[in-house]
Amino acid sequence: MPVLRSTFIALSRNRPLRRFCEQSRLGSRLSSRFIAGTEIADAVRVAESVNRQGMAVTLDSLGESVTSDVEAHRSAEVYHQLLDIIESRKLNANISVKLTQMGLEQSQVLAESIALSLAQHAKATGNFVRIDMEDSKLTQVTLDIVRRLNARPETKGAIGVVIQAYLYRSQADVEQLLADGIRIRLCKGAYKEPAEVAFPRKSEVDENFVLLSKKLLDSNVFHGLATHDEAMVAAAKSYAKQHSIARSRFEFQMLYGVRRDLQRSLVKEGFGVRVYVPFGREWYPYFMRRLAERPANVIFLAKNFFRA
């Protein structure tokens, strides 16, 4: 793993730096490129703007592992509010949820019950819940919960999951999820993982991403290909064209503030694009992972630091 990426991932776990950044005006200003803001109203404002540009949205209330049932239910309430707002404002948006925010590390039963309530709410309002994938020690339990919820009549089709191409296990996971008809967001993976569970080289991750993309495109389920890598985008477009796969059968997904030029270009070409819009007060770990992923993001940060 490149030194720069390792450094920013390590900094994402630095609590004193996190407190300083999340509480300072400078930190909020620098993060605004990638974070919609701290409040629900900020997220709605950005979602409406993205929709006007012809793109869909997935909303993410930032925050990871909670330490109590009360915190888990408080996190869930934000998402219930979002589902109601999406319906009332007629936003082209869904929600992305981390199970650790729903208490997974305290109780699997708690996390699954909260995810069930969100999926029921989503289905009742014609919406959809994407369960985010976290580090590899949570992969199996996350997939188990998603599969159980999708098997329930009252939530079937209203819940999907994320698969990370850098994990060795992902091909088998994709095949099982496709057999169950579960919608997938395919990404490369943003967490630091050991070579025992993940491909260590970018070229291997890219190769697996392309392989898994083709499996998704060949299915009759609507999926999202989450990448800012133009080579990955080009490979998917080429495969879809060669196999007469309609553009309505998949979408590209990208992060708010990253590769806006590519987002606009894909929309002009007639491809579906969904923008991942995060918001909330606990934005620091997410922000640092974005810096770890792309050197261009670090350059952007440096320029704006000196302007600030």
Outline where the language-model segments fall:
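Positively charged, amphipathic and often flexible ligand-engagement surfaces
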Residues: 1-308
